[in-house]
Amino acid sequence: MIQVQTRLRVGDNSGAKELMCIKVLGGSMRRYASIGDIIVASVKEATPGGVVKKGDVVKAVVVRTKKEIKRKDGTYIRFSENAAVVIKDDRSPRGTRIFGPVARELRDRDFMKIISLAPEVI
């Protein structure tokens, strides 16, 4: 569960290291984001020479959350950190590599490029 002011690690090589959520997209009073949801975030920490700089406002998709989510078969999945991938307006990732595992739920939300770049889909 990601809400406004939540800090997330970045799971790609776009140049950002840490994001802070400033808006959850999808509804006027929407409060929480889960895996597969799009957020608007501010870059709080970045690597020098990256595509995005500190202070940039970017869109990102949540790929890992510490809060567990329930699947249709009754199992639960959770990760050890909150992480997101910076995306463009056409929902494709801004980086060329994805780090760490991503959840299978991204496939249902049509983030196939992120699924194909990820080293592990859980």
Swiss-Prot record:
GO cellular component, one term: cytosolic large ribosomal subunit
An MF annotation (GO) of this entry: structural constituent of ribosome
Annotated signal peptide: none
CDD domains tied to this protein: Ribosomal_uL14
A Pfam match: Ribosomal_L14
InterPro entries the record matches: Ribosomal_uL14, Ribosomal_uL14_bac-type, Ribosomal_uL14_CS, Ribosomal_uL14_sf
One GO BP annotation of this record: translation
Keywords for this protein: Ribonucleoprotein, Ribosomal protein, RNA-binding, rRNA-binding
PANTHER family assigned: 50S/60S RIBOSOMAL PROTEIN L14/L23, LARGE RIBOSOMAL SUBUNIT PROTEIN UL14M
Task performed by this protein: Binds to 23S rRNA. Forms part of two intersubunit bridges in the 70S ribosome.
Assembly and interaction partners: Part of the 50S ribosomal subunit. Forms a cluster with proteins L3 and L19. In the 70S ribosome, L14 and L19 interact and together make contacts with the 16S rRNA in bridges B5 and B8.
NCBIfam families: rplN_bact
Recorded family membership: Belongs to the universal ribosomal protein uL14 family.
Protein name listed in UniProt: Large ribosomal subunit protein uL14
The species this protein was found in: Desulfitobacterium hafniense (strain DSM 10664 / DCB-2)
The organism's taxonomic lineage, starting at the top: Bacteria, Bacillati, Bacillota, Clostridia, Eubacteriales
